[in-house]
């Protein structure tokens, strides 16, 4: 009898190990950087008009790689304006890395950082308890809506905190990605707990449409090299498989039939393409920019 499957998030150390490997093996941050360089300036064009201070809220800011790029674009548009950058991030380890990154980055003199070591839900609950509803000029939620209990309520809450000329930016996997194919088919077989759920930009679109909110959608092509997943016993392959299935030690704990089906699925054109002897998983993302 094999040991039962466990959600990857129940082992934070392994989760972050697999997440870092995912970033190293994918164009995830590269395609986000291209968006921030090319299209973000237009998004933040008028968020600070007439303001002496710009308030930015990063929900799930992680280790700050993308946050600092966003800040540089806001600074370029509004030089010398004071920026308050608040970060909601439940992982102390990620906050530590974020602070290190800030310390190593120049030109942040006019940015005041405040870190809140809590989840989005804990932040909302605390603000409600303190009867506070601070408004923001820019809120971003990058690759974090998988980790909230109630997606529509979370979007509603943070949308309600937007200033009249503000924007809410969400990045999630596309509804046209390997993730969508894999998770729509096998998600119910993976051991998700209440820490994590599968949601894609297609789901967010439905939520926004039903709330009659105005938004723009950008498609970001991205891929992840999963060739090592098909090498029996390969440590990196096993970690990437854990990340794909959100399952701790998937290779060792999944029922053989489920493992066989998932490995087959990952090779199919709906999930991946073969290029130069590599298997490249479709990691396409969507950026959704929501108006107040």
Language-model segments: residues:
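Class I SAM-dependent methyltransferase Rossmann-like catalytic core
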Residues: 1-51
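Glycine-rich phosphate-binding loop signature in dinucleotide/nucleotide-binding domains
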Residues: 50-51, 129-135
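Class I SAM-dependent methyltransferase SAM/SAH-binding core
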Residues: 54-126
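Short aromatic-enriched loop/helix-cap "lid" or pocket-rim segments at secondary-structure transitions
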Residues: 98-100, 127-129, 180-184, 229-231
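Conserved Class I S-adenosyl-L-methionine
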Residues: 133, 199, 209, 214-292
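A short SAM/SAH-binding and catalytic strip from SAM-dependent methyltransferases
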Residues: 134-152
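A short glycine-rich, Lys/Arg-flanked "PGG" loop and its adjoining helix->strand segment in the class I
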Residues: 152-167
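Conserved class I S-adenosyl-L-methionine
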Residues: 166-196
């Amino acid at each position: 009898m094999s040991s039962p499957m466990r959600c990857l998030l129940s082992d934070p150390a392994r989760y972050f190990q697999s997440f870092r490997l995912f970033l190293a093996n994918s164009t995830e941050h590269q395609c986000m950087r291209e968006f921030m360089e090319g299209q973000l300036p237009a998004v933040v064009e008028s968020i600070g008009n007439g303001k002496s201070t710009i308030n930015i809220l990063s929900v799930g800011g992680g280790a700050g790689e993308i946050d600092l790029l966003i800040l540089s674009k806001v600074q370029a548009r509004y030089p010398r304006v004071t920026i308050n950058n608040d970060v909601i991030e439940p992982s102390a380890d990620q906050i530590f890395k974020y602070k290190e990154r800030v310390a190593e980055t120049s030109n942040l003199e006019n940015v005041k950082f405040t870190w809140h070591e809590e989840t989005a839900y804990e932040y909302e609950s605390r603000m409600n308890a303190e009867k506070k509803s601070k408004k923001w000029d820019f809120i971003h939620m990058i690759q974090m809506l998988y980790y909230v209990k109630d997606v529509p309520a979370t979007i509603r809450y943070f949308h309600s905190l937007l200033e009249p000329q503000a924007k809410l930016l969400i990045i999630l996997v596309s509804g046209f990605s390997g993730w969508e194919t894999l998770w729509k088919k096998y998600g119910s077989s993976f051991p998700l707990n209440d820490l994590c759920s599968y949601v894609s930009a297609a789901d967010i679109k439905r939520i926004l449409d039903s709330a009659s909110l105005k938004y723009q959608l950008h498609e970001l092509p991205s891929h992840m090299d999963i060739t090592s997943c098909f090498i029996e016993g390969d440590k990196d392959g096993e970690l990437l498989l854990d990340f794909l299935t959100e399952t701790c030690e998937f290779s060792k704990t999944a029922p053989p039939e489920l493992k066989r089906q998932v490995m087959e699925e990952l090779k199919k054109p709906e999930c991946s393409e073969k290029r130069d002897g590599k298997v490249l998983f479709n990691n396409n993302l969507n950026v959704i920019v929501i108006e107040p």
